[in-house]
């Protein structure tokens, strides 16, 4: 009964490590504890979201650990995300710390951009999470004959794609949200609303991966594990 059975809900399993040495000091701890959180969760986002492209604050900087699921990467997001929420957005699209001109992540999710029939996603680096859902999407795209390219995507290219009509979809992917469609983004005070398209990739990818997760289809990749 503790494991949710509603569609979109799940038992979120998250391993973590924290320092336990009985001392307060400016040095790494000599003792740590490993634990696993098992938490029932509902659907992260129930509908498409609006995001703000960040121009001032940064999630991670080169030379850091933005690629990892580390608590410090989340703490720095809280304040700018609250500002974005007060402005009518649900999440922030993070940009590179050096120039704020290249998109990196959407909230706590990796981000995908569809220009024409091609999907683009930023390559992983020390500032971009090496997400397991991102890896899964790249695998599914290959088998679904969806062309995908890993390369930096600038804010200017995103806006140009919107203006020319080449921008078809924008969505984030992650373990909590799975696939979260973005139907509006804001940049420098201007709002850009993305119209629905025929044969969208985001719901197809979400259905494909959730069907595998829920055992509705075969798992040719060996992604499912029985938890006892």
Sequence positions of predicted segments:
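Short, glycine/charge-rich beta-strand/loop segments that flank catalytic centers
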Residues: 4-22
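Helix-start/capping segments and mature chain N-termini
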Residues: 16-19, 23-228
């Amino acid at each position: 009964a503790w494991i949710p059975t509603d569609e979109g809900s799940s038992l979120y399993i998250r391993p973590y490590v924290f320092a336990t040495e009985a001392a307060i000091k400016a040095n790494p701890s000599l003792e740590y504890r490993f634990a696993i959180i098992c938490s029932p969760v509902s659907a992260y986002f129930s509908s498409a979201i609006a995001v703000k492209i960040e121009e001032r604050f940064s999630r991670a900087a080169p030379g850091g650990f933005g690629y990892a699921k580390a608590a410090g990467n989340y703490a720095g997001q809280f304040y700018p995300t609250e500002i974005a929420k007060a402005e009518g957005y649900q999440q922030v699209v993070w940009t590179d710390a050096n120039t704020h001109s290249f998109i990196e992540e959407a909230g706590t999710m990796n981000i995908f951009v569809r220009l024409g029939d091609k999907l683009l996603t930023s390559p992983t680096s020390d500032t971009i999470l090496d997400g397991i859902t991102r890896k899964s999407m790249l695998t599914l795209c290959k088998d679904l004959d969806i062309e995908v390219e890993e390369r930096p995507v600038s804010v200017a290219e995103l806006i140009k794609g919107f203006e020319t009509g080449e921008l078809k979809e924008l969505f984030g992917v992650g373990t909590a949200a799975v696939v979260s469609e973005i139907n509006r983004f804001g940049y420098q005070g201007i709002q850009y609303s993305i119209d629905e398209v025929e044969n969208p990739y985001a719901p197809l990818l979400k259905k494909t991966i959730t069907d595998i997760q829920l055992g509705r289809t075969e798992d040719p990749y060996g992604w499912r594990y029985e938890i006892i």
